[in-house]
């Protein structure tokens, strides 16, 4: 299965006991199965596993939000350009950058009762969909479409629905 090429940069705070590159690669493969525009090895994604301070600074600079967030995505292409790049057999095109915050990811995983690996997998899928042009902040229909793609990708990896409400 083709998927975007991932270039990883992992801050030591994430540790080396877990194969984060493998987790991100499997997430990319699953995302490519549910969003065919990602099913191409001619798309390049930079994935940075950072600490909260780095994500906080980026979130403040680029989104005017003075706090860290779980994942930031910086697309390099419009939705139309993504679809065109996916059809191009030329050299890899830069889809964009994605940055995950370790502390936020760890806290959210604990709140959700899932492993950090599971939550990080979800965030990589979420970030890839943003880079492909999906945006849950555009409206309810867009949010539902994106969440459904996330659910499908995660289900392919045996990961439960992250949006399911527990009674």
UniProtKB/Swiss-Prot annotation:
Signal peptide: none annotated. GO terms for cellular component: cytoplasm. It is found in: Cytoplasm. GO terms for molecular function: metalloendopeptidase activity; RNA endonuclease activity; zinc ion binding. Its cofactor is Zn(2+). Keywords: Cytoplasm, Endonuclease, Hydrolase, Metal-binding, Nuclease, Ribosome biogenesis, rRNA processing, Zinc. Its EC number is 3.1.-.-. Disulfide bonds: none annotated. One of its GO terms (biological process) is rRNA processing. Zn(2+) binds at residues 126, 130, 136. Its main location: cytoplasm. Binds 1 zinc ion. Belongs to the endoribonuclease YbeY family. PANTHER family: ENDORIBONUCLEASE YBEY, CHLOROPLASTIC. Single strand-specific metallo-endoribonuclease involved in late-stage 70S ribosome quality control and in maturation of the 3' terminus of the 16S rRNA. This is Endoribonuclease YbeY. The lineage of its organism: Bacteria, Pseudomonadati, Pseudomonadota, Alphaproteobacteria, Sphingomonadales.
